Amino acid sequence: MPTVFPDDSVGLVSPQTLHFNEPLELTSGKSLAEYDLVIETYGELNATQSNAVLICHALSGHHHAAGYHSVDERKPGWWDSCIGPGKPIDTRKFFVVALNNLGGCNGSSGPASINPATGKVYGADFPMVTVEDWVHSQARLADRLGIRQWAAVVGGSLGGMQALQWTISYPERVRHCLCIASAPKLSAQNIAFNEVARQAILSDPEFLGGYFQEQGVIPKRGLKLARMVGHITYLSDDAMGAKFGRVLKTEKLNYDLHSVEFQVESYLRYQGEEFSTRFDANTYLLMTKALDYFDPAAAHGDDLVRTLEGVEADFCLMSFTTDWRFSPARSREIVDALIAAKKNVSYLEIDAPQGHDAFLMPIPRYLQAFSGYMNRISV
């Protein structure tokens, strides 16, 4: 834990909760009569409101993207390597907004929050929200903050999908889009992985149809398995081999069906256990479904070029060589469509062994390229 924060840290930060009374119509046909969004901001909004950057989070992300909530906090925000003075998203230049999306479980309205109409936890009654719904709620957030146009909307993985959707839904409100380790839609394999994770949760006896909180229980077993499956897909084979290989946790093989004998087994169990103590099962179901549903070209005859013809932003896409969850080929689909639509786009495929999670890591070539693009943005 830090006693003195590094010079390139945003330091101590405090989340804010913003309440919205105007009903939000959702893609599903349902609506939220009112809702909360929890945000953090870093840096200062300039006089012309031209330096604002929106950070969109991935599946298990949230509003705490940088800095520390207290001097006792063990780790900084989830993207601290990229946000702060002198970092790619330089808070001396930019006013940065990070939020917890609707349906999340870190303070924004979601399945784990109280339904104001009933006074009870939403649970399974919280309506399905999509990437488009998130973007519409984020646009209202921008209005509340007095931001007419984002200098950039930035995100990795599911966050990159939101950044892309911003340029489609609100083309005049985004000058730059940074879409990292993402895709224009999920492959069948990705949907399959999500379904296995969901079934792990749904088959947990303590899930109770999504109303487990009313009974004071948590479907930890299902959440743990879901996270273990997901975590495997976030790492590359090379990264897992280098980190664990076939190293034993025990001195020798026990030839026992129930023993945790390999280091990689122990690691996955730890990751699953830790995740199950901090994440909501209904939120996990919702987030994976939002991933599955994302397909902006579907409304344009499955033609991604047509879908992107109306965008006005400049684009930067980055992918990682060993990412097999969202492979470089998926980013190139977006790049090729943007080129065909005669849009400005930069693309970099970064050689990195870490797999999909590379977008979260302080890889020098990645940070250098990220900084290079952000430095070009005028405010």
Curated annotation (Swiss-Prot):
GO terms for biological process, alphabetical: methionine biosynthetic process
Modulation of this protein's activity: Requires MetW for activity.
Membrane-spanning residues: none
Keyword set, alphabetical order: Acyltransferase, Amino-acid biosynthesis, Cytoplasm, Methionine biosynthesis, Transferase
Top-rank EC class of the record's enzyme: transferase
Signal peptide region: none
Active site per UniProt: 157 (nucleophile), 323, 356
GO cellular component annotations of the record: cytoplasm
UniProt keyword Acyltransferase present: yes
PANTHER family in alphabetical order: HOMOSERINE O-ACETYLTRANSFERASE (PTHR32268:SF11)
Family, as annotated: Belongs to the AB hydrolase superfamily. MetX family.
Protein name: Homoserine O-succinyltransferase
